[in-house]
Amino acid sequence: MRFGLGLFAISILLILFSTDLIAQMPGRSIKNNSHRLTRFRGPNLKFPEYKRYSFAGVSINSMNYFGDLSPASNISSTDLNYSRPGFTLSYGRKYGPNYWWRISYSWGTLRGDDFDSADPNNEVAQYRYIRNLHFRNRISELAFTFHLDLLENPYTYLRRPGWTPYIFLGVALFHHNPKARVPESDVQTGYQFENAGEWVSLQPLGTEGQNTGLYNNKPYRRIQPAIPFGLGVTKRIADQWDISLEIGLRYLFFDYIDDVSGGYVDLGLFDDPMARAMSDRSQEITGGARAKPRDFTIIEGITSKHTYVGADGRSYTVYHGYGSDLHSSNIRGNINDRDIYIITSLKLSRIVKPYQKTRRFR
């Protein structure tokens, strides 16, 4: 998350610096300035209407995630094995020599899995392996972004550069719904689930006690705001065609895109056996979305079990720090670091409304 905030700050500084630099550039000549004055058409002297144009594009993208279910606590540990194809549809308009806006709709999938990503022999990742959580989240995003080209083109689209790097910043709303596969049974009570293996929504279950009213958290919303920012480069391939490569991060205002944020809660507070089973999966004999066998020899060499009496009067046996809110190291996720997701895209776009002069009759 610190890396994301750093890139966000750099994007802001680049926008301010580039805008200021362009504003201070001297005119080409007195002759050019006189020519501009004779063509005055309004307040935007530098980029009149006949130079502006609109464009539409389609992208193949990949969404990746960094959060509580990443292999380690740094963004470079993002597991690219969970990259899944998605798409983006976009429409924009260039209205200055080096700035333009874009509205876009993106769809893609985020995934995370402790069993596959966390190495039980790694001292940093072994507790994630014990935790044994996983999720899948389909993202639908609507974004409005402002883009700044780092190379100015004061001419029409026909004279745009062959390569143009750019940075962008904007606002977005996205819909999400984290899901996980249902286990065979609740390891605490032996309750058998008829829909074992199905993907079910985690938000209604309140896996961190959101539905109990006893913890300082509320059910998270499935529609959330975000701040998209990033950079890209555009290659001109024909008079009206461009291809672009872009990477953008989404700064989020919550920490539940993976349904993991705070600590474990008292398992005796759950009335729903499904919610209890999804809250603490550390003792399941299989791991991850693919339900592969786990190595308990490694787990027992790392931690030991602990039994406590829950709020419902039943006894629950958990690993130390997993499932009991009485344990000092009872951490399910890191509430201090918000999740982020990253969209990497390859876009093909076409200029659809170039200005065309009409012949005037005398």
Locations of regions flagged by a protein language model:
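Residues on the lipid-exposed face of transmembrane beta-strands in outer-membrane beta-barrel proteins
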Residues: V58-I60, L89-R93, F144-L150, L169-L173, ...
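Surface-exposed strand-loop-strand hairpins of Gram-negative outer-membrane beta-barrel proteins
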Residues: P48-F55, S59-S90
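Gram-negative (and chloroplast) outer-membrane scaffold detector with strong preference
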Residues: Y99, Y105-N195
